[in-house]
Amino acid sequence: MNKLNSERIEQALQLLGERLALADVGPYGLVVCGGAALISCGLVSRMTTQDVDILAMINMEADFVSPDPLPDELLRIAFQVAEDLDLPETWLNNGPSREPGGLYQRGLPEGIGGRLTRRDFGERLTVYYVSRIDQIYFKVFAAVDSGPGRHVDDLRELRPSPDEIEKAALWAMTHDRSVEFRMVLASMLRQMGFKDVAERI
């Protein structure tokens, strides 16, 4: 199976939009975060990602709605795209916002809707890439919640200012108020060079 680079992400989404139109399905608005958004917006140097992560959907009234579950027709056509392009079956998924513990379900950063970058893939598919500052929020939470590795690597490349990292840390703590989460978060901030921020949270 092929990983997704910027060209493959573009190709997959373009084909998805075309197939949605042929099937007379949609339109769908997808808010995308994670590696696919970082790569497509040129925010990081890493070249590939495993999948396209759907954070939320946007309805015809331009409101955010839950992506759990994703529409069956969207999943069916995404599977066809996977077969055509030799991609993983779950290349398009709602992993970040699945079930009660998901990012959408816990609450998104204030004002996120006004910071999205829009891309149209035909008349039936619109993708909204999450902004740099919102990626910082999500990466801070993910690095503590599921472990460092690529999350911290991405976070370093996003080069947050002390003010940005502090706001992201405070937001992350609203999603997990445990002492353990705060301790791991503070340790990570110190390792990243934000000692003063770690002492304030």
For each of these PLM feature ranges, what is it?
Residues 1-201:
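Compositionally biased terminal segments of proteins
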